[in-house]
Amino acid sequence: MPKMKTNKSAQKRFKKTGSGRFKCKQSHLRHILTKKSTKRKRHLRAASMIHDNDVAMVRRMLPYA
């Protein structure tokens, strides 16, 4: 049986935590930042966890994570 392929775009976006959950960086922090408040940008810097409904999809894309 051949090896399963890792989805490279998912590999760059998601990291598996020690407890088995997946974390990712929040969006809306790349450009058009002048109109966003400092508080909003500060809160967007924090990593967020993948929602439970999406975990199966991420696991399928990252078989060796």
From Swiss-Prot:
Gene3D superfamilies: 4.10.410.60. One of its GO terms (cellular component) is cytosolic large ribosomal subunit. Keywords: Ribonucleoprotein, Ribosomal protein. Transmembrane segments: none annotated. Residues 1-26 are annotated as: Disordered. InterPro entries: Ribosomal_bL35, Ribosomal_bL35-like, Ribosomal_bL35_CS, Ribosomal_bL35_sf. Pfam families: Ribosomal_L35p (PF01632). One of its GO terms (biological process) is translation. GO terms for molecular function: structural constituent of ribosome. Residues 10-26 have a biased composition (Basic residues). Belongs to the bacterial ribosomal protein bL35 family. PANTHER family: 54S RIBOSOMAL PROTEIN BL35M, LARGE RIBOSOMAL SUBUNIT PROTEIN BL35M. This is Large ribosomal subunit protein bL35. The gene is rpmI.
